């Protein structure tokens, strides 16, 4: 979005901040990162009325403790947009992005809390599966452009097809 708004410096700074913040949990990504990249702030409930009397009023966000599979597609899509806009991805960054794609191959079949941050039992969400497909598709695009190593590209291609089949037969 920042690139499309004509803010390439801010887009680059955000991309590198995200890669830096996620370094400690690599290849896993957290749902939320504080601005300083530190540990999440716990969620707490306040004894106040919210908008139009709604309750509970929460400070913080418990989603930080959830699994949301869509975040991997967001990151790899961002990396591809950055690279296509002329951003340089060094070898180490390419290896890290490939590691994220490898992780997606291992975890996409799991249920998650989805972008809706469901607070109960994790479920299979179409959006989450689609974003796992996006993650692997964008990893393949980055691979084809020489930005990430191709060592596991055949696995990514196989899993892209498996995710598509899952979406077409089990999702709605």
Q: Could you say what each language-model-derived stretch is?
A:
Residues 1-172:
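Acidic, mature catalytic/reactive cores of soluble proteins
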């Amino acid at each position: 979005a920042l690139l499309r708004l004509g803010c390439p410096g801010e887009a680059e700074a955000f991309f590198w901040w995200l890669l830096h913040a996620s370094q400690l949990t690599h290849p896993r990504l957290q749902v939320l990162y504080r601005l300083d990249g530190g540990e999440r702030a716990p969620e707490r409930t306040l004894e106040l009325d919210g908008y139009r009397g709604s309750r509970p009023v929460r400070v913080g966000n418990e989603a930080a403790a959830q699994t949301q599979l869509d975040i991997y597609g967001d990151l790899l899509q961002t990396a591809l947009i950055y690279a296509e806009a002329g951003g340089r991805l060094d070898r180490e960054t390419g290896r890290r992005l490939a590691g994220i794609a490898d992780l997606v191959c291992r975890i996409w079949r799991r249920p998650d809390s989805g972008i809706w941050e469901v607070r109960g039992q994790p479920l299979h969400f179409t959006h989450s599966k689609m974003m796992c497909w996006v993650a692997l598709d964008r990893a393949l695009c980055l691979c084809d452009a020489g930005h990430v190593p191709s060592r596991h590209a055949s696995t990514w291609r196989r899993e892209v097809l498996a995710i598509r089949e899952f979406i077409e037969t089990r999702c709605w």
